[in-house]
């Protein structure tokens, strides 16, 4: 019979190591999502996202299929994982995007909430390889701003990686008042801005392929007296190894 001291067991444990537990997973289909591109899956998505946040965080899984949704909101420690051949498509109905105060061209004003939105949360993001499609039909005289596809506001540790975004009636992505933002290996296609970094700090944009009709990447920090009053600069931004095509305005702009 062999005996092991506590010190020996601890040493062996340190050498072998223990695998970290996988993140909790919440499949949108388990919450009623259909994924046929016709029936709206907004409620199912929001239930999955809320359950993930309440459980302390994890991943919300979007399996293959085409999911028609209105605006949904991500919570704390929640990653939306778009699996292979998964497509999220924004609804064409403006009523599926609640009205709220939004940041637009450097000022706060009433507007429609983004397709995928987050506010005042930590450790949130979206990872691929799926696709998110905005809906240009939402942009109309009664909604001149259109609907941004991805818009976290006042969030910390935001991660977007490895998926495709096609624009709808507005900018593709608009992180606002966020800290520690990582945007990596995104493909963005559309006729408006690709990435608008608005009064954010510690932002890394790398290995992205952006082809837009307007600015590919734009750095913003407010406008006029309102921008001076709020006093939130965009700072410490690293952009590297990106392919940028701006067909009408700038590939990289600061305004």
Where are these regions (language model features)?
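Bacterial N-terminal signal peptides
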Residues: 5-17
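Extracellular/periplasmic carbohydrate-active domains that bind, remodel
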Residues: 18-255
